[in-house]
Curated annotation (Swiss-Prot):
The gene is sodC. Keywords: Antioxidant, Copper, Cytoplasm, Disulfide bond, Metal-binding, Oxidoreductase, Zinc. This is Superoxide dismutase [Cu-Zn]. Signal peptide: none annotated. Disulfide bonds join 58-147. The lineage of its organism: Eukaryota, Fungi, Dikarya, Ascomycota, Pezizomycotina.
Length: 154
């Protein structure tokens, strides 16, 4: 079992943790999140980005992690970036707690997300269905108020 965590923080009040667990290279990864301080009653995009670099804040993380050269999509789509995690839903206080399993996100192997950045976005991910070029790259999820590098957890 490999476990990893991204401690989420940034230039906003958004913070929290996103954890990853994978039993072996052939099993889905469980992704769990506990995010606070976001917009109330909203769906907000979150993605694994290419680089584990936060030198200039979350913008240094680069584009979505996309080792297979696909266009942006929903987590359940065949055509999607590895880093496309979709949206989480916040409650009336702007907090979100949840989990999902993902067959493309890996902690083990050549396409591992370890050392890359988990970015929480300011907007809703349109899952590549926005009808414009930016939708096929980013899901029009907007600015990056908070992020954290995915590191090995105890």
């Amino acid at each position: 079992m490999v476990k990893a965590v991204a401690v989420i923080r940034g230039d906003s009040k958004v913070s929290g943790t996103v954890t990853f667990e994978q039993a072996n290279e052939n099993t889905p990864t469980t992704i769990s999140w506990n995010i606070t301080g976001h917009d109330a009653n909203a769906e907000r995009g979150f993605h694994v980005h290419q680089f584990g670099d936060n030198t200039n804040g979350c913008t240094s993380a680069g584009p979505h992690f996309n080792p297979y050269g696909k266009t942006h999509g929903a987590p359940e789509d065949d055509e999607r970036h590895v880093g496309d995690l979709g949206n989480f839903k916040t409650d009336a206080e702007g907090n979100a707690v949840g989990s999902k399993q993902d067959k493309l996100v890996k902690l083990i192997g050549a396409e591992s997300v370890l050392g890359r950045t988990l970015v929480v976005h300011a907007g809703t991910d349109d899952l590549g269905r926005g009808g414009n070029e930016e939708s096929k790259k980013t899901g029009n999820a907007g600015p990056r108020p908070a992020c954290g590098v995915i590191g090995i957890a105890a």
